[in-house]
Amino acid sequence: MLEITLLGTGSPIPDPDRAGPSTLVRAGAQAFLVDCGRGVLQRAAAVGVGAAGLSAVLLTHLHSDHIAELGDVLITSWVTNFAADPAPLPIIGPPGTAEVVEATLKAFGHDIGYRIAHHADLTTPPPIEVHEYTAGPAWDRDGVTIRVAPTDHRPVTPTIGFRIESDGASVVLAGDTVPCDSLDQLAAGADALVHTVIRKDIVTQIPQQRVKDICDYHSSVREAAATANRAGVGTLVMTHYVPAIGPGQEEQWRALAATEFSGRIEVGNDLHRVEVHPRR
């Protein structure tokens, strides 16, 4: 069984009720943080997961709303890990990830120096291990595998999605993307697909062109549902709602998705959990 927790379902616009885009996937004793939107560690703490308890951080792409809290994750995982010789924290992302991680650690350079000077048991900077992928196997440990495939969020490139499998169950995390063959293939037959969604029918009515621009590189609710249908997934889990879902509007979003997908549809707020079991 895999467990999905929507840690943050918000957008780049700060929302008092929604953290930035981030999803936690738990597979037995392993915990994977997919993207690091603002507020993610507080949301993770609410479900009993600390930064030092993460098995790996998976980044779908390097847009600011998806990596806003990366620095906090890196530093907090370091200062709250009390093992004598802690293993490096794996960061898995697209090309460019190593550069972003290096720059993030440099930005926190003074803080890192202060802590090393103050604590006798902190003698080196945060141990980080970066792996960059555009496609193929990315993880195989203790019965959990992760595979990567390219997505389409152009002009943001490259961007990737992840397929996590354990004990016969599978979850695909699409990240930000328009429909594309590579995502269909990655998600084929998966038990669950976590997909970011926007309401293009609403966004196109907003007067500012900069806001309307997001329509050409994100999937609408119906497009995400159509991807789920083509791929033959069991459950569609929607997240990263743009605009934010208002109180009592969840069924509107679910009904839109149901026009394209007849399977289980999950629409949830932050901390919404979905258990994923292998389909028989």
UniProtKB/Swiss-Prot annotation:
Q: Which Gene3D superfamilies match?
A: Ribonuclease Z/Hydroxyacylglutathione hydrolase-like
The protein's name: Ribonuclease Z
Which cofactor(s) are needed, names only? Zn(2+)
Keyword GTP-binding present in the record's keywords: the answer is: no
Q: Which residues form the active site?
A: D65 (proton acceptor)
Q: Which reaction does it catalyse?
A: Endonucleolytic cleavage of RNA, removing extra 3' nucleotides from tRNA precursor, generating 3' termini of tRNAs. A 3'-hydroxy group is left at the tRNA terminus and a 5'-phosphoryl group is left at the trailer molecule
Q: Which organism is it from?
A: Mycobacterium bovis (strain BCG / Pasteur 1173P2)
The UniProt keyword set, sorted, is: Endonuclease, Hydrolase, Metal-binding, Nuclease, tRNA processing, Zinc
Function, as annotated, reads: Zinc phosphodiesterase, which displays some tRNA 3'-processing endonuclease activity. Probably involved in tRNA maturation, by removing a 3'-trailer from precursor tRNA.
GO MF annotations, alphabetized:
3'-tRNA processing endoribonuclease activity; metal ion binding
Family per similarity comment: Belongs to the RNase Z family.
Its subunit composition reads: Homodimer.
Per the UniProt entry, the disulfide pairs are none
| EC annotation from Swiss-Prot or TrEMBL | 3.1.26.11
Task: Give the taxonomic lineage as stored in the record.
Answer: Bacteria, Bacillati, Actinomycetota, Actinomycetes, Mycobacteriales
Gene symbol of the encoding locus? rnz
Q: Report residues binding Zn(2+) 2.
A: D65, H66, D176, H240
- The entry's Zn(2+) 1-binding residues are H61, H63, H153, D176
Cofactor annotation remark: Binds 2 Zn(2+) ions.
